[in-house]
Amino acid sequence: MVPGGEIQELATSLKLELKEQMNIKYALKSPAHITLKMPFSYNEAKEKVLIEKLENFLSTKKSLIIKVGGTDTFGKRVIFWKVQADSSLTELQTDLKTFCKRELNLVDELSDRNYHPHMTIAFKDVKERDFDEAKALIQKSDINHPLHVCSVELLKRLDGKWVVIQSLKMASD
């Protein structure tokens, strides 16, 4: 799920500031997003079929409200904004996991079984010496933002960057 507007602008601005001040730039390879399914390989010739199947699946799922607020970490390697939602987000992820296994023949990954929704701001290239300063910079953003999610975006890696290739609408409320 790739939010637009203010939240995307703030995340990008923080990523650019981290790059400028500490040369932390890996997170700039993708827009700020909340992952529902980890990256997977898929036959490019069947991409249109993939999109159609995902459109059909998501057209039955209701939009949801989530809140992006607060900063947390995974160890000393990943700094992210926390995502809070009711059970509808976990249900969507579980349903998508089942759909991907059944309809796309994709295997369950560890991250599919241990879902922890978040929005990464810095990861992989955060040096230990910069970690606390980077975390403090992100915490200063003091984000507390409700988000109405009415679409899910399909990202594809092109020329080393993740780009949205399709926005898939969810059912109207």
Range-by-range predicted roles:
Residues 30, 74-75, 158:
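Structural motif
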